[in-house]
Design a protein with these regions (language model features):
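Bacterial N-terminal signal peptides that target proteins for export
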Residues: 1-9
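N-terminal targeting/docking segments
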Residues: 2-3, 18-21, 126-131
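Positively charged, low-complexity intrinsically disordered regions
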Residues: 6-7, 23-25, 53, 125, ...
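Bacterial N-terminal signal peptides
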Residues: 9-19
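Central antiparallel beta-sheet cores of small beta-barrel/beta-sandwich binding domains
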Residues: 24-100, 106-112, 116, 131-215, ...
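Intrinsically disordered, low-complexity Ser/Thr-rich linker and spacer segments
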Residues: 121-140, 236-239
């Protein structure tokens, strides 16, 4: 009887320890999150996708007004604390905490412009959703490489970097980055190259470039369109 009693006590202790350890392990923030940033008179609907890695960081994207799948920066996950930055016009830093049940992520959003601090709350609604890398038809060698341009908007000059490359499998890929808004590389969603004419779509920011490459292959001259906004944009090949 004593042996049986001792066995039960040991088993109870082990189970108790296991439960304690499990309770101390925070939930994984990986997943698709939906919610809003709360302003005094309105709520701005947003969606965030996170995929945690083993080093306290991870991969993430942001979707909101006129933005879908914009890459997040500075992702940091420490226990229940989760932080990330949206490096875009109107963006800012998110700092939040994961609820014990792993279903809610809430905290504060600090806007880049004005430094306003606003509450946000997100609810988990499934697995993280990331678009597969886009592969377009092969482009001419005159388009391959890195291109630099300057876009004028509301009296501000923004430096734009465009990268286009052919891949070994016969496809092409591209990215666009605003060097004055965090230099985040946004994937190009479509590249069309017919003779000298070039069309580049950037679905993430609902933007597109339509233009032509010169005979020397040193300039791309055209127009950038994003919603109702249009402006001339000329890229020069980087040496």
């Amino acid at each position: 009887m004593k042996t049986g009693h001792r066995t039960l006590l040991v088993a109870a202790a082990v189970l108790s320890t296991t439960s304690f350890l499990r309770a101390q392990s925070p939930a994984d923030p990986s997943g698709h999150w939906q919610g809003a940033i709360r302003m005094p008179n309105q709520a701005i609907a947003i969606e965030v996708d996170l995929d945690r890695n083993t080093t306290g960081g991870g991969k993430g994207t942001f979707s909101g007004v006129n933005i879908k799948g914009y890459p997040l920066s500075d992702i940091a996950i420490d226990g229940a604390a989760v932080a990330f930055t949206l490096k875009v016009d109107g963006g800012g830093a998110f700092s939040g905490k994961l609820a014990a049940d792993g279903k809610v992520l809430s905290g504060e959003f600090t806007a880049n412009s004005g430094g306003y601090v606003l509450p946000f709350e997100l609810s988990r609604s499934g697995e993280a959703k990331f678009d597969a890398p886009v592969k377009n038809p092969r482009i001419g060698k005159e388009l391959e490489g890195t291109w630099s341009g300057a876009l004028e908007a509301n009296g501000t000059t923004m430096r734009i970097l465009l990268k286009l490359a052919n891949q070994p499998d016969g496809t092409s890929t591209g990215s666009l980055a605003n060097l004055d808004q965090g230099a985040v590389e946004i994937p190009v969603s479509a590249i069309t190259h017919t003779a000298a004419n070039v069309n580049i779509d950037v679905k993430v920011v609902s933007g597109s470039f339509s233009g032509a490459v010169n005979a020397a292959g040193t300039e791309l001259t055209g127009t950038w369109s994003q919603g109702a906004f249009t402006a001339p944009l000329t890229f020069h090949r980087d040496k």
